[in-house]
Amino acid sequence: IISIARLVENKQIKHQVEVIKQLVTKHPNIQLNIYGHGNGLSEYRQLVEDYHLSEHVKFHGFKTHINEEIAKAELMLSTSKMEGFGLAILESLSVGTPVISYDVDYGPSELIQDGFNGYLVPQGDINQMVEKVDQLLNNTQKLQQFSINSIESAQQYNATTISTKWQNILN
């Protein structure tokens, strides 16, 4: 599982750590790789340590070329309180990594079609996020279908498609 976010309160990284805490017994090989930087890093590291999750939650800092890491992940988590057009979500979908996100205004619901290329869960509902992650980790067929659907849904944002749309508007 991957997360790409600034390590600040608004992104609610604590919620992602809570998700892993609840799933680690059922999924002992679960791994959350968090990419990003911010002033919350020491607090989140301490939380991971307090929960004895150091083997399951890793902080990798900021990375400019992240697509390879996203493509390796089975899922992406987004727990932001508010989100514009989420480029990290779009990048994930474009490489076939489904996203489970809080359903906050704007961004996520523009990109994620609930039950097609990921899941949207109510903002702050950690238990439902746990349930959705568990569902996909337990159902490789559904996970693979979501992956295919992710790539398909991201196609509408590729350069060729956008260029054609602009040409149609300008003509």
Language-model features, listed with the residues they occupy:
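Nucleotide-activated donor-binding/catalytic signature segment of Leloir-type glycosyltransferases, i.e.
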Residues: R45-G61
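Short hydrophobic beta-strand element within catalytic cores of glycosyltransferases
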Residues: P98-Y102
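C-terminal "capping" alpha-helix adjacent to the active site of nucleotide-linked donor transferases
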Residues: V19, D125-Q144, I148, Q167
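Aromatic "clamp/platform" in nucleotide-sugar-dependent glycosyltransferases that forms part
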Residues: F62, K81
